[in-house]
Swiss-Prot record:
InterPro entries documented for this protein: Ribosomal_bL9, Ribosomal_bL9/RNase_H1_N, Ribosomal_bL9_bac/chp, Ribosomal_bL9_C, Ribosomal_bL9_C_sf, Ribosomal_bL9_N, Ribosomal_bL9_N_sf
Function: Binds to the 23S rRNA.
Keyword match rRNA-binding: yes
Transmembrane domains' residue ranges: none
UniProt key word Ribonucleoprotein: yes
GO process terms (BP): translation
GO cellular component terms attached to this protein's record: cytosol; ribonucleoprotein complex; ribosome
NCBIfam families membership: L9
Entry superkingdom: Bacteria
Family per similarity comment: Belongs to the bacterial ribosomal protein bL9 family.
Descriptive protein name: Large ribosomal subunit protein bL9
Entry keywords, A to Z: Ribonucleoprotein, Ribosomal protein, RNA-binding, rRNA-binding
Signal sequence residues: none
């Protein structure tokens, strides 16, 4: 079935494109949700008239993606994670964790646009993560996973400091 897309769709096409999709996908998803309309003579004429505004909108999206890319290229995320004695993380880092951290920094990035080359990050180190912003425009950010100090280390440090205070000495850390 041929439909005309009303907005950009990843792996399908851009707004105003006429695409061939399976009947069930069109009837059960694209048409009821308002993502597309049937490709008939009337709708084709309407979209031909809107083509100029669609192109302006796409150019504006491309410009916004370039601006966002220049800001994201400077971002470095740090995660402090707990691990077992062998150095394996108790919790891996995935695209949801990265999207949440980016949101805290003021970047509203959809989870599906974040591409972790290794699937999930399960060990300590620095990784390159790609964020797909627009067709042909992507940003690479650095994600660093560091070891979180164990609770025992914190307790022993505070005990040393308290003991030194009682004795009026300086604690060696």
């Amino acid at each position: 079935m041929k439909v005309i897309l009303k907005e950009d769709f990843i792996n399908l096409g851009k707004e105003g494109d006429t695409v061939e999709v399976r009947d069930g996908f069109a009837r059960n998803y694209l048409l009821p949700k308002g993502f597309a309309v049937f490709s008939n003579k009337h709708n084709i004429e309407i979209f031909n008239q809107k083509r100029r505004s669609i192109l302006k909108k796409q150019e504006a999206k491309k410009q916004m993606a370039n601006d966002l890319k220049s800001k994201l290229d400077l971002v470095k995320l740090e995660f402090f994670m707990k691990s077992n004695d062998s150095g394996k993380l108790f919790h891996s880092i995935n695209s949801l964790n990265i999207a949440d951290e980016l949101l805290k920094l003021g970047f509203d990035i959809e989870r599906k646009k974040i591409d972790i080359h290794h699937g999930t990050l399960k060990t300590f180190g620095t990784y390159d993560v790609t964020i797909k912003l627009y067709e042909g425009i992507s940003s690479i950010i650095k994600v660093e996973i560091k070891k979180e100090k164990k609770q025992e280390d914190k307790k022993s440090l505070s005990k040393k400091l308290n003991k030194a205070d009682e004795q009026g000495e300086r604690a060696e850390v």
